[in-house]
Amino acid sequence: MQKVVKLNNIKIGNDLPFVLITGPCQIEGKDHALFMAEKLVKLTSKLEIPFIYKSSFDKANRTSVHGIRGVGIEKGLEILSKVKSEFDCPIVTDVHSESQCTATAEVADILQIPAFLCRQTDLLQAAAKTGKIVKVKKGQFLAPWDMKNVQTKLETFGVKDILFTERGACFGYNNLVSDMRSLAIMAELNVPVVFDATHSVQQPGGLGGSTGGERKYVELLAKAATSVGIAGMYMEVHQDPDNAPSDGPCMMKLDNLESILIKLKKYDKITKEK
């Protein structure tokens, strides 16, 4: 029996219809966050896809010291709280240090551990203490079976509901590849698995002072992952990704999201037919 994580009226499981985790890479301000949330709530309601809003208050691992990091934790959580109350949608956002976990848990339903920090024991323990769902992005440097150690840490710290996310593996310099076997291997740990279709096309540091990406492959990888069978699809979106403050080359254009989701629903249905 595959593990199912319950969040309000949403059920997240590898054998269930996929949940969509989406939003802009970073919080750019209240008006932009509300604009994006409204569009995404309407679209996912129309397509009957369970929806969790994602955006980050701080991009703490920017390539360059000059990279825009975000609005900060205080303002960011205030904006996410507004999104949550106005649109009645669950929230996931990143935490980068133990000191951020308690405050973030007052707003977010899911605490996300960034890939670079997935083995940081103190951070995992601090996230666990909040009692929230903990979503860990598999490090680009880790084998999928190594996530068993992350799972053991979290369960030792008392976490009942864990989500793992595949976001590509390092393949030489400035490049990632997606090994679709990772999805099945992590699912064998009896943890719901999410595929991050946009960060998987990153070219880390590929633009010298910032990260590049190959947006044209997002749909292809999303289809492949959905064909394997996943609990959730993670895609960052923006109305104008080429002018976004971070991860623009990877993010999907908002106007293109509906057509992709319609296709993914078909793949998902076929994959999970009994």
Curated annotation (Swiss-Prot):
Q: Which SUPFAM superfamilies match?
A: Aldolase (SSF51569)
- Organism of origin is Rickettsia rickettsii (strain Sheila Smith)
Cross-referenced Gene3D superfamilies, in alphabetical order?
A: Aldolase class I
Gene name, per UniProt, is kdsA
Task: Say if the entry is tagged with keyword Transmembrane helix.
Answer: no
Q: Which PANTHER family match?
A: PHOSPHO-2-DEHYDRO-3-DEOXYHEPTONATE ALDOLASE (PTHR21057)
| Gene Ontology biological process terms in this record | keto-3-deoxy-D-manno-octulosonic acid biosynthetic process
**Catalytically driven reaction(s):** D-arabinose 5-phosphate + phosphoenolpyruvate + H2O = 3-deoxy-alpha-D-manno-2-octulosonate-8-phosphate + phosphate
User: What are the GO MF terms of this UniProt record?
Assistant: 3-deoxy-8-phosphooctulonate synthase activity
Show the InterPro entries listed in the entry: Aldolase_TIM, DAHP1/KDSA, KDO8P_synthase
Principal location: cytoplasm
Which UniProt keywords are present, listed alphabetically?
Cytoplasm, Lipopolysaccharide biosynthesis, Transferase
Q: Where in the cell is it found?
A: Cytoplasm
Question: What domain of life?
Answer: Bacteria
Pfam hit, one? DAHP_synth_1
Q: What is its EC number?
A: 2.5.1.55
Q: In which pathway does it act?
A: Carbohydrate biosynthesis; 3-deoxy-D-manno-octulosonate biosynthesis; 3-deoxy-D-manno-octulosonate from D-ribulose 5-phosphate: step 2/3; Bacterial outer membrane biogenesis; lipopolysaccharide biosynthesis
Q: Which NCBIfam families match?
A: KDO8P_synth (TIGR01362), PRK05198.1 (NF003543)
Specify the protein name. 2-dehydro-3-deoxyphosphooctonate aldolase
Record's family? Belongs to the KdsA family.
Would you name any one GO CC term? Answer: cytoplasm
